[in-house]
Amino acid sequence: WVAAQQVTESTKDYAVVEKIDANYENAVNPSVKLIKADGTKATAAIDSDSDTNIVAGELVKYKTNNDGSVEMTKAKTANSGKNLVNDTLNILSNATVSYNKNTKQLAFGDNTKKATTSDCVAFIEYETGKYMVAPSDSLGSFTSKTGKAYISLDKDGKVVAFLVSTDGKPSNNAS
């Protein structure tokens, strides 16, 4: 289930890699299948300037070139919620993330909290290899499974996009 959604300039450049050619750095005409922030899927050629070692299941920042190919940027490693870097797509390798629908914040195991932007996009892996995409404001409160968490912050330190894994789909934010 994917909810179509309005995406803004700050959130449209994020996608989950659904499928990517193995060893794409050395492949001829390598391609990638992305689940974009608006919930649509797209297959595109991989630009040679893309970061290396990108695998399925990662959240990437991307730009589409004039020829239709995509240049993808990997997340940078952060050791904890306190170490998340502004204006960067971060990855926490072993995190539990909670979303609070009332405060519109993500909380990390080290008691760090980060506010989400009004247009924040949540990518949720609710079953292995199955994703939902939704505005974070539309979700009910939830806690992720412990594991990789991708958190992208804007220059002000607010969350613009994130990817976490959960046991099942989070509820919607019915008040």
Language model regions located:
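...the same signal can extend to comparable exposed beta-sheet modules
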Residues: 1-175
